[in-house]
């Protein structure tokens, strides 16, 4: 079932968001592991972020997805993927979706200080000034605790 979750999150032309959400919930209620990974340590959440699907991201978070899970190959978290300028092929022009996803991940506890295998945090990749500001605010709050 992990691949089924990923398949729903990787649709190039996803169905309406509510339909995608219902499909994910059905799989999760049937026992799919929300944090299952493929051979590269990539979760359904990583895929949902890459394919710029806020509805899928929100649903997976609601069902306990680990927002700080790192990929085995690159060490990237879902937040790393969210702030990069390019998503998956076919997701061009979805900047607003990327911003919404960053907000969802941060609200769920994504740590903007986590470095990938290249030693870079999400803030090292972000180009959008609003995203940069959100990451900086979260980093300051984390350090203040």
What are the functions of these language-model segments?
Residues 106-107, 111-143:
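Leucine-rich solenoid repeat scaffolds
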Residues 49-76:
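Alpha-helical adaptor scaffolds
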Residues 1-40:
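N-terminal segments that cap or nucleate solenoid repeat domains
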Residues 34-37, 67-71, 112-115:
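Ankyrin repeat boundary signal
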């Amino acid at each position: 079932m992990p691949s089924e979750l990923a398949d729903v999150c990787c649709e190039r032309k996803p169905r309406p968001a509510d339909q995608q959400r219902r499909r994910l919930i059905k799989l999760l209620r049937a026992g799919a592991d929300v944090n299952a990974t493929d051979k590269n340590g990539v979760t359904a959440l990583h895929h949902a972020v890459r394919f710029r699907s806020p509805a899928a991201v929100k649903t997976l978070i609601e069902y306990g997805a680990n927002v700080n899970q790192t990929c085995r190959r690159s060490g990237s978290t879902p937040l790393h993927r969210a702030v990069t300028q390019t998503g998956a092929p076919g997701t061009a022009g979805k900047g607003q979706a990327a911003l919404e996803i960053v907000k969802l991940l941060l609200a769920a506890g994504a740590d903007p200080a986590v470095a990938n295998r290249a030693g870079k945090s999400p803030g090292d990749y972000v180009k959008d000034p609003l995203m940069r500001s959100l990451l900086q605010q979260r980093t300051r709050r984390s350090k203040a605790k």
